[in-house]
Amino acid sequence: TYLIKDVNGILYGGGSLGRKDLPIGNNISLGCIKMDLSAIEKPVKLNLEVRIQGTDAVNDWDFWVYPAQVTTQSGDVYITETLDKQALDILETGGKVLITAAGKISYGKNIVQHFTPVFWNTSWFKMRPPHTTGIWVNEHHPMFKEFPTEYHSNLQWWELLNKTQVMQFTHFPVE
């Protein structure tokens, strides 16, 4: 059987995959699960749980669903490719700045960013790149209102983080 739930336990779907003999091994298809996603109007993290009834055998996987159409708000964020005077002025007055400087950063460019779990982080193997193991996120920040996340990176971060350029803030002012 399978269940599809959100983080609050709200059921989005469920059913049976039928009964079949399962050989010992890996990557054995249990069947096909189809779910209509069109009714989902805002981004949501879901969890698929598959269980063999009458046993303790259970496994689950997280996945994220985003609506096909979204309405964006222009907001009050200054977007720039460099930490220019306007960005500094905006920050000085408590404003918001997004720096999209990929490929233009020199300090920290020796740090190679890939989206790898700790187990496969090559820092364990002669310090070859990549040198990162993920991110730490303030998941309660208002900017994540429509982007379901936890305090750490997960698979929904793949497109945003994999092979992106690192920006090191070691010598930036603390303020």
Where are these regions (language model features)?
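Local beta-strand/beta-hairpin segments that build beta-sheet-rich folds
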Residues: 11-14, 28-32, 56-58, 167-175
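Short alpha-beta junction capping motif
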Residues: 70, 75-123
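Exposed aromatic-hydrophobic patches
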Residues: 26-39, 62
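Extracellular ectodomain segments of secreted/surface proteins
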Residues: 1, 66-70
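Beta-strand-rich binding/interaction modules
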Residues: 1-20, 30-33, 43-53
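Edge beta-strands of extracellular beta-sandwich domains
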Residues: 57-67
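Catalytic beta-strand/loop cores that center a nucleophilic Ser/Cys/Thr
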Residues: 43, 105-107, 123-175
